Regions:
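Active-site-proximal alpha-helical segments within enzyme catalytic domains
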Residues: 196-200, 244-265, 319-335
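Active-site helix/loop module of the DD-peptidase/beta-lactamase fold
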Residues: 118-156, 205-243
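Short active-site loop at a secondary-structure junction
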Residues: 74-79, 91-134, 145, 182-189, ...
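Active-site SXXK
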Residues: 86, 100-125, 153, 197-201, ...
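A small/polar active-site loop signature that marks catalytic segments
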Residues: 155-234
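Active-site Gly/Thr loop motif
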Residues: 225, 230, 281-330
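C-terminal motif of bacterial Sec signal peptides marking the signal peptidase cleavage site
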Residues: 20-21
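A short, well-structured edge-of-sheet supersecondary motif
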Residues: 64-95, 322, 328-332
């Protein structure tokens, strides 16, 4: 049987550092694991491209990974990418294809807020009245609704239940009655909140949202596929405030996940303030499922994810960046929305299988 290029490269690498003899074959039942810290001469970071190693060389169970692949094939997902301690161990599917990220966009903008708040350009304690925010589509905001702060919008706790651009039918069906909850008293996953977060960012910084994503994340993280032209502003007659969809590849999303897995640091630069990473991935609301909610990040409930701390950027039927900071692990899952036929139960089963293979 012919060995893959990656397999030959890994065997050569192991032999070159003295971990296996030159006569060993991929069929050997045991391979001495590589320590990524020693292998990289310190912490592993991607450069212009990702470094890839066989998962078995990093101590993963090949049998358990076979079960991951079975689930992945069953789901017909578009891509799965797994980063273990800064090194790619799984790259399946179209990991360089730019898909619309759906609601994963919100966690990226949360990161931008952290940067600009740290620089003093944004104050999340400001309310809608102070910012001059209303909605020109009737009925406009009441004085009570205008007391909602940016922090409450980040938490999806504004109490403003105005119709919004890019709402799914499920969001529309779940929207509370207008004026039924005061700001800060109730969680509802609210596109009006998230869209206004984007509008206020532009207002306070004077910068285009997609250019800021490029300058603040794509450039320093050396993203391979993202450009400002990947995004657009989606206006609808329901509200004056647009949504801000953008497309990104799995391999670029993984860089953002790794940034947050490492407390906002990239190599020797603190991109996102460490205290913002902690604050934005803290749970403020119980969503009723496997997750709580932070500042436009989903926060895994204790003991649900094999005892690990986990937070995630989730979007659509299955777009996800799962971040496990305690074990320096990032998992990115992508779907081709028009053809994908499964949902979050299958995605979570896939993630469970990944964690079992890692352990």
């Amino acid at each position: 049987m012919r060995m893959s290029v990656l397999g030959r490269r890994t065997v050569f690498l192991l032999a070159s550092v003295g971990l296996i003899s030159c006569g060993a074959t991929p069929a050997d039942p045991y391979v001495e694991p590589i320590d990524p810290v020693e292998h990289c001469g310190g912490t592993c970071w991607p450069g212009e491209t990702w470094e890839e190693l066989e998962a078995a060389a990093l101590g993963w169970s090949t049998d358990a990974l076979d079960r991951v692949r079975e689930q992945y094939a069953h789901m017909a997902s578009n891509a799965l990418l797994v980063v273990d301690r800064g090194v790619l161990v799984v790259r399946w599917g179209q990991t360089n294809r730019n898909h619309i990220v759906q609601s994963v966009r919100k966690s990226f903008v949360s990161g931008l807020y952290g940067i600009y708040e740290g620089e003093g350009a944004i104050d999340i304690s400001l309310d809608m009245a102070a910012l001059g925010i209303d909605d020109s589509v009737p009925p406009s905001l009441t004085d009570l609704e205008k007391q909602a702060t940016l922090q409450q919008l980040l938490q999806a706790r504004s109490g403003v239940y105005h119709e919004a651009a890019a709402e799914s039918q499920g969001m529309k069906d779940a929207r509370p009655e207008r004026w039924s909850h005061a700001p800060g008293t109730f969680y509802y996953y609210n596109n009006w909140d998230f869209n206004v977060i984007g509008v206020v960012f532009i207002q306070l910084t004077g910068e285009d949202l997609f250019q800021a994503l490029y300058d603040r994340f794509a450039v320093p993280l050396q993203m391979q596929d993202f450009a400002p032209s990947n995004g657009f502003y989606q206006y609808e007659t329901l509200s004056e405030h647009p949504a801000y969809p953008f497309a990104m590849s799995a391999q670029d999303m993984a860089r953002y996940g790794l940034l947050f897995a490492r407390q906002g640091q990239w190599r020797d630069e603190q991109i996102v303030p460490e205290d913002w990473v902690e604050e934005s991935t803290t749970a403020y609301s119980d969503t009723g499922g496997d997750f709580n909610y932070g500042y436009m990040w989903w926060v895994g409930k204790p003991d649900r994810f094999h005892g690990h701390r986990m937070f995630a950027a989730l979007g659509g039927a299955g777009h996800a960046i799962f971040v496990f900071p305690d074990i320096d692990l990032v998992v990115v899952h992508r779907v081709d929305a028009p053809t994908y036929r499964y949902g979050w139960n299958e995605v979570m089963e896939l993630l469970d299988r990944v964690i079992r293979a890692r352990q």
